Amino acid sequence: LEAVSHASDTHYGYGDSAAKEIGGDVLKHAEMVHTGLKEYKDVDKXGPVAKELSGLPSGPSAGSGPPPSALFAQIHQGESITHALKHVADDEKTHKNPADKAQSGPVRXGPKPFSASKPGISPSPKPVTKKWRXENXENVSNLVIDDTELKSVNSTLQIKXXINSISVDNYKVPXISINKXDGRHIYLSKNSLDCEIVSAKSSEMNVLIPTEGGDFNEFPVPEQXKXIWNGQK
């Protein structure tokens, strides 16, 4: 506080000398500064900081609780601390008076947990025009497409993603297209020996041709092709 007071007195001296030399509006500003410093000094002399430094009491602190010794004395009472509790009669108890419990209003239950429904399984896919659609099938070993017509012509059966096996009966297959497949076995009947097999980005493919005895002869499909330029193509 003494340092602040000394600095303000020094500013008074320099401010007065500068104001006299310059004059004009500077005198008005100097008077405003002097007034502000005077008010600061008046407040500083009677403020809480000055009282603390001078040793004067600054007033009791609000909300002061009982001393810690009284709290520990209550804790060490043990079972006798319950003697101060008031006895509650039966007619004042809520669980023995259903009427009072009903007046308190219904208890709101929280939202029920959401349970996602599992996708259904369509054991018999329905045809869409000339295409059959099988979806949401899991662990189904007897998936059969039976809603068909005999002697179908210009029909297309397209299968995407993974599949274990597929059988096509009573159809003459003119072409089989396989793309991005690994480990495929194609069984051809006697009526489909003239079909064309087109494969791309596939490996481990075998074509099985029926024999007179009912068995099949296995022929691998080449995974690599050799191209030779003959001068024109």
UniProtKB/Swiss-Prot annotation:
Feature: compositional bias, Low complexity? 53-64
Modified-residue entries (Phosphotyrosine), positions: 14
What keywords are assigned to this protein?
Answer: Actin-binding, Cell membrane, Isopeptide bond, Membrane, Methylation, Phosphoprotein, Ubl conjugation
What does the entry list under GO cellular component?
cytoplasm; plasma membrane
Localization of this protein: Cell membrane
A GO molecular function annotation here is: actin binding
Residues with N6-methyllysine modification: 101
Enumerate the residue ranges of region (Disordered): 43-71, 91-129
Q: Which residues carry this modification: Phosphoserine?
A: 17, 104, 115, 122, 124
Q: Which PROSITE patterns match?
A: CAP_2
Q: How does it sit in the membrane?
A: Peripheral membrane protein
Pfam families attached to this UniProt entry: CAP_C (PF08603)
GO biological process, alphabetically ordered: actin filament organization; cAMP-mediated signaling; cell morphogenesis
Cross-link named Glycyl lysine isopeptide (Lys-Gly) (interchain with G-Cter in SUMO1), sites: 151
Residues in domain C-CAP/cofactor C-like? 173-221
SUBUNIT field: Homodimer. Binds actin monomers.
Relate the protein's function as given in its record.
Directly regulates filament dynamics and has been implicated in a number of complex developmental and morphological processes, including mRNA localization and the establishment of cell polarity.
UniProt similarity note: Belongs to the CAP family.
From the Swiss-Prot or TrEMBL record, give the protein name.
Answer: Adenylyl cyclase-associated protein 1
Q: Which organism is it from?
A: Sus scrofa (Pig)
Q: Please spell out the taxonomic lineage of the organism that makes this protein.
A: Eukaryota, Metazoa, Chordata, Craniata, Vertebrata
- Supply the gene name: CAP1
